[in-house]
Amino acid sequence: MKKLTKEQILMIHNELIRETGGSVGLRDEGLLDSALNAPFQGFEDVDNFPSLQQKGARLGYGLICNHAFVDGNKRIGAHIMLLFLSLNGIELEYTQEELSDLILNVAAGKLQFEDMVKWVIKHQV
């Protein structure tokens, strides 16, 4: 399994902000660490998120909901979720509207982590 480092994610965030606008900066490093580590945690030999689809969705969900960055939390959450899945051989097919609806509804608290997992599985090719 391929994972992105914290440094890579910070670099990607800075590039997203540069390209799409907003304020660069980390609001809370602890919340970022929590979002990045949660998908890979477990207890004893039991992985909390055993599938790559679950790990990718948890990564996106944590980045969106933890609000670790000053700006661009939804953008980085969506981007990192898709990048992680792609790096691990999982390609998705979706419209921009479908992705936007997912991310905005997660950010608004209308969809939960489980909904993101279902979305990923539904759109997997």
Where do the model's predicted regions map?
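FIC/Doc superfamily catalytic core
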Residues: 1-125
